[in-house]
């Protein structure tokens, strides 16, 4: 057989093998993983390799590490979305969990795709603190509040991020007239007073949270600005 004919036959065979890939393989959801922010734990995924997203539905299950039986997530059983909120099912931040997703399309069902082991305490990302400022003469009183969590205590109030992590707050102040930024505070207190500001100048305050254990920091907060009379 001529070389070019053999090459053409090989390509045809490979193409046919790909096109006739079993549905349970070609429909299998991809990139199934948890994305967690402030302990709000959302399972995300992408459609299978066959790219049959139109008309496809998904089924979601979850379990705690060490448990034998998977549990259905009713709100995401037959969903057309590419995500599922599993916050209520993964409330213990120290517990490791798994999630998995199956896809159905045109009467065919994929295999399950499982996440890596997910522990919220290790993997959640923190939003910046909420910053409020009050001017008192030539000083600024800065109050910092960590982001709210989905967990509630026995009185029904949201628990603080400080219940789970040692947090360090970093506050910077920007002199808009000089376009100069400098650190004003770094520590664990959530109430800070910045003194000695120059009259007739505009200042902005920005803050972030730092987790020493993970050497990890949050994004910076929105700037809060004020004019010193």
Swiss-Prot record:
SUPFAM superfamilies, A to Z: Fibronectin type III (SSF49265)
Residue positions with a glycan: 54
Positions bearing the site annotation: Critical for IL22-binding: 65, 117
Single GO BP term: cytokine-mediated signaling pathway
One CC-aspect GO term: extracellular region
GO MF, one example: interleukin-22 receptor activity
Covalent S-S links between cysteines: 76-84, 204-225
Subcellular location: Secreted
Residue ranges of domain Fibronectin type-III in the record: 28-127, 128-229
UniProt keywords, alphabetically: Disulfide bond, Glycoprotein, Receptor, Repeat, Secreted, Signal
Pfam families in the record: Interfer-bind, Tissue_fac
Stretch forming the signal peptide: 1-19
Keyword Repeat appears in the UniProt entry: yes
Function: Receptor for IL22. Binds to IL22, prevents interaction with the functional IL-22R complex and blocks the activity of IL22 (in vitro). May play an important role as an IL22 antagonist in the regulation of inflammatory responses.
Homology family: Belongs to the type II cytokine receptor family.
Protein name in the entry: Interleukin-22 receptor subunit alpha-2
């Amino acid at each position: 057989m001529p070389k070019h004919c053999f090459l053409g036959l090989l390509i045809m065979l490979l193409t046919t093998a790909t096109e006739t890939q079993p549905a349970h393989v070609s429909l299998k959801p991809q990139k199934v993983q948890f994305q967690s922010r402030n302990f709000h734990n959302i399972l995300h995924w992408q459609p299978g390799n066959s790219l049959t997203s139109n008309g496809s539905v998904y089924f979601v299950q979850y379990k705690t590490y060490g448990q034998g039986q998977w549990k259905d997530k009713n709100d995401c059983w037959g969903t057309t979305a590419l995500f599922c909120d599993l916050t209520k099912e993964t409330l213990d931040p120290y517990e490791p969990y798994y999630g998995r997703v199956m896809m159905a399309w045109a009467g065919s069902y994929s295999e399950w795709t499982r996440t890596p082991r997910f522990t919220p305490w290790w993997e959640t990302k923190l939003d910046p603190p909420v910053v409020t400022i009050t001017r008192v003469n030539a000083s600024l009183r800065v109050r910092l509040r960590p982001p709210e969590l989905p967990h509630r205590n026995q009185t029904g109030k949201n628990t603080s991020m400080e219940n789970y992590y040692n947090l360090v707050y970093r506050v910077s102040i920007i002199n808009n007239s000089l376009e100069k930024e400098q650190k004003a505070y770094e520590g664990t207190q959530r109430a800070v007073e910045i003194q000695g500001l120059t009259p007739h100048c505009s200042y902005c305050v920005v803050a972030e949270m730092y987790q020493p254990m993970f050497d990890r920091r949050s994004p910076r907060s929105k700037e809060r600005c004020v004019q010193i009379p």
